[in-house]
Amino acid sequence: MAYRDQPLGELALSIPRASALFRKYDMDYCCGGKQTLSRAAARKELDVEVIEAELAKLAEQPIEKDWRSAPLAEIIDHIIVRYHDRHREQLPELILQATKVERVHADKPSVPKGLTKYLTMLHEELSSHMMKEEQILFPMIKQGMGSQAMGPISVMESEHDEAGELLEVIKHTTNNVTPPPEACTTWKAMYNGINELIDDLMDHISLENNVLFPRALAGE
């Protein structure tokens, strides 16, 4: 099956582990989820046929949960428990680790200078963002008022873009989240945690941008 003309966001939701494949190729399937596979591959100078072949293999596996057809209230509850609560645990721990690594290894050229600052910015932005969703937008959608939520949804999507930009800065600061040979245990653990955060946050944004928000605006 040809996947090149399908949007990345749709592929990430319909094919098991497609999101991990896109992460491997540094393709943005959350904020950039509306771009086609062909367009995204061209921008990264990648062979779209190779990626299509990998997607075809992944598509043979059964999908765990198809959120595209789940009730909106169920999607919202899942987002809060699986992503919001998790981000609230992840970021404070990563900030502590980054503070330690930047202090202890300040003299090393490979130290990720500024990482603590960027993680703190992401934590503050996400904390405010998630609170607005939980207190304003999500209740509107659960009450069947999603079609009237164009304003709040537009703001949330803009904030998703800002979070995505911060992730790019964090990846640049950490050499694409790759620890140097001299990295200590804390440094390696922190990078593992950052990779997990990036995976979670991209899946989180993808589910909202590509499923929850469009369906809510359509009046479901």
UniProtKB/Swiss-Prot annotation:
Gene3D superfamilies reported in the protein's UniProt record: nmb1532 protein domain like
GO molecular function, one term: metal ion binding
GO CC terms, sorted: cytoplasm
Transmembrane as UniProt keyword: no
GO biological process, one term: response to nitrosative stress
Record keywords: Cytoplasm, Iron, Metal-binding, Stress response
CDD domains xref list: Hr-like (cd12108)
Keyword rRNA-binding part of the UniProt annotation: no
Compartments reported by the entry: Cytoplasm
InterPro entries named in the record: FeS-repair_YftE, Hemerythrin-like, RIC_family
Highest taxon of the lineage: Bacteria
Main location: cytoplasm
Assembly, per entry: Homodimer.
Function of the protein: Di-iron-containing protein involved in the repair of iron-sulfur clusters damaged by oxidative and nitrosative stress conditions.
Family to which the UniProt record says this protein belongs: Belongs to the RIC family. YtfE subfamily.
Protein's recorded name: Iron-sulfur cluster repair protein YtfE
